[in-house]
Structure formats: C-alpha cells, structure tokens
A protein has these predicted regions:
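C-terminal regulatory
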Residues: 1-92
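A late-sequence structural motif
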Residues: 84-116
Length: 116
C-alpha cells in the first residue's frame, strides 16, 4: 500500500488514505474514537469482525489499519505509520487456578504474555 499510495506524514494526511476498520457490530476498539475523528467514512474501504482478517487485509495492501504492535513485530513487509497513542493500550488479565499458578507451563505462558 505504502509503495503505491505513500505514507501519511501526519494525522491530517490520513483523510487521503484508505483504511481497514472493524465492523460496527463488534464492540468498540480502543482506537475507534481516533478513527471517528480522523478517517472519513468514505475512506474505510474494508470492514471485518475478525482481527485476523483485518491484519491480512493490511498485509494484502488494501489499506492502512490499526494492528497490535506484537502481531507485526519483526515483519519487514509491515511499516509502522505512526506511533501508538497511550489511549489505545489494552489491559490484559491472565487468571490461573491457584494450584496451577506455579507450574512450568503456566509460568512460561505468563512470561510470554508479559513480554507482549
């Protein structure tokens, strides 16, 4: 997408670009208010209820989209267009059974989640 249409240099430039969005039937994402303020409805060219489909649409060059940083980290084909805003952060709670909390498998998973 960037090779064909260029990269927005500011938030104001976003109104000149195509975007991938979340279907309105999905509960509001943390970044939805930013979309509502900065992306004209006519520039949202693809909607999905699935994060996996949204990510694939961005990878396929259909438009720009909001993706978790960890899902594209280390992928040379993906370019971070703008830094994430603090308001987009999502808190993740990991709950375990108290008898399993100290097991190696659970600790490994908690370590992986905390690295994200």
């Amino acid at each position: 997408y960037i090779e064909q249409y260029g990269q927005p240099s500011s938030t104001a430039d976003c109104s000149d670009h195509n975007f991938i969005g979340a279907d309105p039937s999905v509960p509001k994402r943390t970044w939805q208010a930013w979309y509502d303020q900065n992306v004209p409805a006519k520039r949202i060219v693809f909607l999905s209820t699935s994060n996996v489909v949204i990510e694939q649409a961005v990878r396929d060059g259909i438009g720009l989209g909001m993706l978790p940083v960890h899902s594209v980290h280390g992928n040379p084909d993906m370019i971070q267009v703008m830094p994430p805003e603090q308001a987009w952060n999502v808190h993740l709670w990991a709950v375990t059974h108290r008898d399993l909390h100290r097991s190696a498998k659970v600790q490994a998973m908690l370590g992986l989640l905390s690295a994200i």
